[in-house]
Amino acid sequence: QNLNNGPHWLGLLVDSVDTVLALEPDHAALKKLGTKVGVAARRQAPAGSLIRRANREARAFAPSTHIANDPTDLEVRAFAAPVGIAEDPVTGSLNASLAQWLMADGHMPAAYSARQGTVLGRSGQVFLSQDTHGQVWVGGDVVGCIQGTVNL
């Protein structure tokens, strides 16, 4: 899916969280592709309900039990080799674009949470919601990694 809410992403919805977490992308090939790629999978989604709501492409989904007690609804990975970032631990622009697409196509409800950064050991959780006007909002907590002052 072509995703563009300012930053451009190629979005992929795959069959399971296990598939997302097992990806070993060729970053040189992704850099040549020239666009950032986001990959996501629903966590513990009822397979039948997703198949019934599939749009023109044939899609088959199966629930994952990779992280059995994880409260999040979606697992996300962001590969941004074209801008010099092999994998980003948590990406607001990607999660917002994914939410616009997945909510519009009925794959996700109007409010859900996503986990990203698991493979990097920098797991983060974001909360996504769509208001009554159709605007998608992204929120979450931050972990400060560095603090300082820049004098210009």
Give the location of each predicted region.
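Active-site proximal loop and beta-alpha junction motif in alpha/beta enzyme cores
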Residues: 1-152
